[in-house]
């Protein structure tokens, strides 16, 4: 039976009674098989598995995007129970931000590129909430998908910079059969948009250059924020209708 704990103090009281290793999967809910893969990895390698569900307002720079973020609590709980998750931490905004976000964690170089250039303040919100979650949960290992590769890299950097005693475990992107990266935002695509969406993965995989991939997507009706090569990885963000999709591949 999965325990559901609402406040940091309630969770910490539970956590103090536990022994052994803790695998942690932080999420914003609307769970899909990509999240399930993170949970399975955590289950395989730890004594206890903790899942958090918190739609974090400080990482949304568009209030409409926050309002439209899908919430699927019953399905999320069913997935947690199916995968033997020991506890779900399911806090509210005042629980997580007693300071109303006066204190924050920020990184001032890599967080300004790629998604950071298009979503001001986004990564401050991500790093701040993840730091809070790590402090409450005190995990041995925390699991993050490579789909959000920039986020993963920034969190790894934060853990190293602040000497945090846990291991970050990257998990490869889980894709639909047609190549589209699994994402909670995919639920918001219309049937027509859903048919078009795999073009993102095809463009960044098959194009010789980032510019060629961007041109291909624009020609197919996507509004492209960026296609950029950084090191040995190609990153993309593009809008299809109302939905902004991101992906990346090794090149």
UniProtKB/Swiss-Prot annotation:
Enzyme class (EC, first level): ligase
Keyword presence, Cytoplasm: yes
InterPro entries to which the protein is assigned, alphabetical: Cyt_trans-like, Pantoate_ligase, Pantoate_ligase_C, Rossmann-like_a/b/a_fold
EC number: 6.3.2.1
Keywords: ATP-binding, Cytoplasm, Ligase, Nucleotide-binding, Pantothenate biosynthesis
Pathway: Cofactor biosynthesis; (R)-pantothenate biosynthesis; (R)-pantothenate from (R)-pantoate and beta-alanine: step 1/1
GO biological process: pantothenate biosynthetic process
Catalytic reaction(s) noted: (R)-pantoate + beta-alanine + ATP = (R)-pantothenate + AMP + diphosphate + H(+)
Binding-site list for ATP: 28-35, 145-148, 174, 182-185
Membership in a protein family: Belongs to the pantothenate synthetase family.
Quaternary structure annotation from Swiss-Prot or TrEMBL: Homodimer.
Protein name per UniProt: Pantothenate synthetase
Organism: Bdellovibrio bacteriovorus (strain ATCC 15356 / DSM 50701 / NCIMB 9529 / HD100)
């Amino acid at each position: 039976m999965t325990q559901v704990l609402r406040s940091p103090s309630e969770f910490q009281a539970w956590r103090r009674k536990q022994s052994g290793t803790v695998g942690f999967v932080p999420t914003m809910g609307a769970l899909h098989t990509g999240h399930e893969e993170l949970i399975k990895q955590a289950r395989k390698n730890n004594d206890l598995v903790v899942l958090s569900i918190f739609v974090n307002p400080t990482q949304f720079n568009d209030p409409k995007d926050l309002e439209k973020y899908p919430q699927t609590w019953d399905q999320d709980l069913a997935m947690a129970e199916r995968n033997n998750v020991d506890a779900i931490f399911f806090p509210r905004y005042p629980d997580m931000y007693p300071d109303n976000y006066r204190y924050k964690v920020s990184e001032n170089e890599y967080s300004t590129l790629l998604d950071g250039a298009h979503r001001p303040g986004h990564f401050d919100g991500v790093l701040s909430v993840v730091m809070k979650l790590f402090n409450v949960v005190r995990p041995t290992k925390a699991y993050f998908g490579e789909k959000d590769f920039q986020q993963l890299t920034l969190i790894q950097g934060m853990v190293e910079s602040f000497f945090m005693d846990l291991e970050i475990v990257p998990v490869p992107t889980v894709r639909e059969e047609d190549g589209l990266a699994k994402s909670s935002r995919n639920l918001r695509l219309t049937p027509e948009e859903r048919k078009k969406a795999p073009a993102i993965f095809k463009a960044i995989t098959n194009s010789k250059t980032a510019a060629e991939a961007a041109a291909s997507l624009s020609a197919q009706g996507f509004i492209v924020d960026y296609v950029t090569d950084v090191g040995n990885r190609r990153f993309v963000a593009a809008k299809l209708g109302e939905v902004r999709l991101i992906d990346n591949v090794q090149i």
